[in-house]
Amino acid sequence: MTGAPPYHPQSPTQQSHYAGYSPSNKPRHYYPNSEHYQQQPPQTPPAFPQPNLARSPHYSHAPSPLPGALPPLNGGAPTPAHPSDPSPQYQAHSAAGTPQYPLPRPYSGSLLPASGTSPYGPSTPSHAHPSSRPDSHAHVSPKKEPESHFAVNHGAPAYSVMREPQASPPKEAKPARAADPMSFASILSGPTEEQAPPKIQSPTPGLGTIHSAVPAANATSLNPPPASFHPKVGDIEPVPPVSAPRLEKKPSADKRQRNTEKEDLKSAENPTNGVTEPPKILRPPRRIMSEKETEMVNKYMVEIDNAEKSDVEAPGFEQERERYILKGKKRALDVERAESIRRKRRRHDYLLKLGKSFEKQANAGMDRFRYANEASVISEVQAKEIQDEKERKKDMQRKRRRENTVRMEMQKKLEAELKANETQDSAEKAKFLREAERAQRKIKTTKRALEGVTEPEEIGEITPLAPNLEGGITSSFHIGRSSPSRRKTGRGGPVTRPKKSKEQKQAEKDAAEAAYAAMENDEPLPLAPREDPRKESLKKDAKGGRSKEATPVPVSTYESKGYNQIYEQIWRDIARKDIPKVYRTKVNSLSTRQENLRKTAQLASKQSRKWQERTNKSMKDTQARAKRTMREMMSFWKRNEREERDLRRLAEKQELESAKRAEAEREANRQKRKLNFLISQTELYSHFIGRKIPGAGGESGDAGVQGTEAMDLTPGAGAKVTNFEDLDFDAEDDTALRQAAMANAQSAVQKAQERARAFDDPNKSTMDTMDDSELNFQNPTSLGDIEISQPTMLTAKLKEYQLKGLNWLVNLYEQGINGILADEMGLGKTIQSISVMAYLAEVHNIWGPFLVIAPASTLHNWQQEITKFVPNIKVLPYWGNAKDRKILRKFWDRKHITYTKESEFHVLVTSYQLVVLDAQYFQKVKWQYMILDEAQAIKSSQSSRWKSLLGFHCRNRLLLTGTPIQNNMQELWALLHFIMPTLFDSHDEFSEWFSKDIESHAQSNTKLNEDQLRRLHMILKPFMLRRVKKHVQQELGDKVEKDVFCDLTYRQRALYTNLRNRVSIMDLIEKAAVGDETDSTTLMNLVMQFRKVCNHPDLFERAETKSPFSLAHFAETASFNIKQSIEDDGAFSFLRFVDTSVGEAFNYSHQGVFERALRRRGQTNRLSRLSVVYDEDESSTATLPHTLFNIVDRNDRQAVYDIAVEGHMRELMNVSRSVFEQEGLNVIEPCAGPAASAPPITLVSSGQEALIETQDALFNVPVQHALFGTPSKAMEEQIIEQQLDPTPYSLPPMLPEPISTKGRYTHIEVPSMRRFVTDSGKLAKLDELLRELKAGGHRVLLYFQMTRMIDLMEEYLTYRNYKYCRLDGSTKLEDRRDTVADFQQRPDIFVFLLSTRAGGLGINLTAADTVIFYDSDWNPTIDSQAMDRAHRLGQTRQVTVYRLITRSTIEERIRKRALQKEEVQRVVISGGAAGGVDFNTRNRDSKTKDIAMWLADDEQAELIEQKEREALERGETFGASKGGKKNAQKRKRDVTLDDMYHEGEGNFDDASAKPSGAATPVSTAENIGTPSASTPVPKRGRGRGGKGTAKRAKTTKERLRLIDGDGGLGSG
């Protein structure tokens, strides 16, 4: 691995320990091509070079500024050490002109340690014991590369035990001294040369000492050693013999001789190149003494020689000397053993690195080959596919032509056979049969060609080369010519070979046999005489000549008719056939001759101009060659420069990648330590609070924090709070970080306590009465025995788990800690919150102010429950318009007010929207307790709602939520951040840990880290209390969930398939990877369209009313007022005789026949005697027996079948109609209707009478009422006002009943409700389900995602006569309470239609025992909240939940994703096992790609996953853009899944009365796949916020609509 670790485990002042390693210096000619960067074989080099090695300029290093820890063993001056730069790529070859990118070098400086100490550990004096460590890699990060030894060991001499393991015996290693060691001659003379090592590697050891004198002198002059290390004359002691080979190592002689001048210059510049020689060797040359000085020296020497001898060499130290020698040998063996281990490790590391290098190069070669040949292979495959397609098309055309040929030839054959059968002439019949046979052969060959069978060639003797039927080897093949045609020559054509007679063939055969026999007998062959054939030929010529001569023939007068016909036929054949052939032949011959002449002329002209070309050819060739050479040279240099540039860029790219990789590793380690610090700090805080609050563990009652109990939680005396940004995660160790986390946690808890005490009244605060020891976090059990009873002012009886929750909330309040009450929905979070307020008022006399913020649909519920359960607490409902709220603020808009029992209000209840609107007023009040109901509304820490609520002055905050995790773990982290903003800061690392390691696990199909889950639960326990129904509420009924799968109907399947075929899933995924807003919006809209089709096709395309086409014009309104006047002039005196008044006569004269018949209707006639026959006694019009002889009115004459009351005779006269009605044919919908209808005939007249009569007939209102039996509106009002019996005024219609009750009198077809139900698979299944539930006495909550679907459901429920009520986002706040109350109190309401978002929060609907989700939400917690409206406290029956899912559609994939989210919530909150969870979800950055995958079917999904794997193997990102401006577009606000599934439904938790907007506009078949009307469409034109689009021409359809006056064209 490359790169250095981000930190060192030891202190900065401590010396680093690295492995000592020095390769042998091979001569430069050893390397291939005399290049010192060539890769070396993986062999183990010699252990150590000479300690005074003078490096070549190619291997020079910068001097180190740090001195060694200890001086050298030989007393020399300490040399500077090399700086410990963690980046190995900047250490090696800094002074040489080497390339600036790393090359593979096995023994270069980048592989060796960079410390300033000895390679064996810390520097020790020569008499100390060696280090006890077996190797020096114990404290080095395994990710750090070994660094160069040459950059390290400049001053400290290295042991040479590994090079020369056999130490010389002590007697041989003893230095040779003078006879008297204390004499001046021995002192002033030069030091005796130490024993040279064995001459194994250096044949000329003397050169090293001679050569190294100059650089050592320079080193002394440039860097003088400290004064404490200057040797004195009296301090010189004999050097131990064992240390001699360890101090010095002679360099190679041949290398010294080759680089003498370079080394001198380099040593002058860099005194630390190599190992500094001891001072006794590096002294300047002696000065020549004068005679006087010499005499003085000799004098003193004589005095010293004559002085008394000392006992330095006296015996008695043999044991110490032996012990010293044994220690030296032991130390040498230890060093040898340690070096052997290091050598093996270096060899292993080097082999691993070499293997990785080979693998990298192999992969790079594979990539280069793929990059170079991929395009050509793709183009070749594409070309082959195109060619194959062309061949296929040709084959199809050829096949069709052959089939047509077979069909035509078969027709010809049949015609020929028919003609042959019909004709009587034998010649004609033979001709037709030949044609039939020819057609049959052609059919046969064509069929063989169709079947792919070729006709085998017949073997014959007429081929150019006869077949070899007798075996043997054929020496040649006839390739030049094709096989001769088997066609016969035409009639009259030349015969290629004359036919022989049988006699000639027999004669030739006999001659051949005779010749063969003669050859076998070696006899001369009998040759036929030449004269005989010649004579025979002459005779034949003579006969022919005589026959051709014009012999005079006597004229015969006889002429035969057949002769003349034959003669004329011959001439006709010649004129018709032969002459055109000869003509064509002559014309072809002439054209060929002319073409040859033209070519000859051209060749001749070229030949004649050759002498001109020959003169200028040399000059032109020279210029051409020069230009060609120049072009080739330019192309060569360009190619060479391009290759060099590419190689340089590649090297730079590799260097940058390696640097980035190293930096990424360092940053990863740093982030890991930072995350560990954050988690440790949080769990320590949670641990302190958990031990303070006994009920923090919920109902589980476990041991809490097990791992933390065992730790020493006592912070040090000097522990102080450290800011997160000030921590150095690279240098600090785990212990220091642990102490810092503990101090920060302690400080956070103490600040929370102090803030709570500062908020309370000092005179009434309970915190002041506590002992100071209670704030000591080492004794947090003082509050463990506090038990709180139920407040007396609370009228309800709390359950056991609710009382436990009250204890937990009170302890949180007294500690000043905020919390999350996350009990499952329906367990009474509201009553627990109310009980806390009652406890504070009763025990601590804290009457407020309390602030309750809830969704708009639950505001009335909060007000009612507080008033019901705690009547002493006054509630102020804060909602309404701005004027109303201003009046309400007069009650609490005071800065300094003390709330008592007599205050005007104690609790203020409002909604989230109003809190944000009036945030400036809420911030002025100091609230004792702020309770947020349905706290998932503040799940985003970036929203203005979250920031506004966080700025309120509150002593404590309490969050109520039944679903703390809805979509991801970041929402839970936002809630924790809200309750403790100082501790749970919004660190990106912590948020990333929550999302990456738990929500969407990075590794495929792996279990969650149990330690991380344990730590997460430990963090959550003190701040969150959660209980589920099945654990704490036994009397609550069970909840059963059932998934009901429905199939797509024919209409749905057609729409679904058509919609999916019109979009390309691959294109959508590729565009989604780019992240363009337009493509994302299109994808969201597509998902919405698919959901519409699954719910009901009428959402996508509503069924239309059909009617025949008619060209008539129908008037909309018509009213006619005709003034009638009656003239009483006495002209109607005759009317008295006809029992008619003047008015009646006037009416009769102005009314038509139908009106007069209508007036007569209902009046009895005088002739009514026949009515007595069939009268019944019970009838009101019956004639009594004693009145039969009275004179009464008679009935009109009627037919017999009309008189009978029972109507049996009428049925006999209308048998067909009766059967039609009894069979039910009259209620069947008509299966067909006329395509067009004729308008009524229009009369055209010059006068007004015809017009008046027509209008009077068409628009006569009384006539219409009489025909259809519908009284006028005024009459109905009078009947109701006067309270009259409507029977006399509601006469039966005079128009007979239509035959079809569905079709009625017209052919207008209204969409059938029965078909409306059966068009949707979900609605058909729901129809069956509701019928069963209605029969069983159940009541239903029906949830929808789209309010448009609720509109359609209202039509269905009206059709089925089910009583229902409705609540969605458009329902006003004041209507919601009444609607819920109606459903709860009226059992006759069967169905409650609700929107999932509007009707799923905070309302109590326990009157229903059945919940049906028509379409599920992608967020499972929303559905859980909705179903818990019925499954909550107060529900005594079992709750059944039905979820309608359309099979094999997008809904199945959405449901699968929702189940994964449910599993995340179960694992994190409930603490369940994570074995069955598939956390292998996609990357969070590619959510749009996941949505696009929902649209694909199984085959497409498998294909997409395969392409993703292939792209991953190539190192690319599937669907990523290749470049372009599209990636640079600025992204606008993202369209989320929430917006997609609930488009236009409005804000359900707002108090606005705006319509939901979810009534999705009806789409037609022409705009499938286009954005719906709910998606904002950019305006057209410039300067209006949209792109300027060109004005397109109108289509023919649009022009016709414009001419017809149909209105808008759709585009506005």
From Swiss-Prot:
All copies of domain DBINO, residue ranges: 570-695
GO cellular component terms listed in the entry, alphabetical order: chromosome, centromeric region; chromosome, telomeric region; Ino80 complex
Biased composition annotated in UniProt, kind: Basic residues: 1523-1533, 1579-1594
Gene3D superfamilies cross-referenced by the UniProt entry: P-loop containing nucleotide triphosphate hydrolases (3.40.50.300), Tandem AAA-ATPase domain (3.40.50.10810)
Domain Helicase C-terminal: 1325-1485
GO MF terms, alphabetically ordered: ATP binding; ATP hydrolysis activity; ATP-dependent chromatin remodeler activity; DNA binding; histone binding
Annotated positions binding ATP: 823-830
Polar residues composition bias: residue spans: 10-25, 1561-1575
Keywords, sorted A to Z: Activator, ATP-binding, Coiled coil, DNA damage, DNA repair, DNA-binding, Hydrolase, Nucleotide-binding, Nucleus, Transcription, Transcription regulation
Motif (DEAQ box): 933-936
Family in the record: Belongs to the SNF2/RAD54 helicase family.
Protein name (record): Chromatin-remodeling ATPase INO80
Originating species: Emericella nidulans (strain FGSC A4 / ATCC 38163 / CBS 112.46 / NRRL 194 / M139) (Aspergillus nidulans)
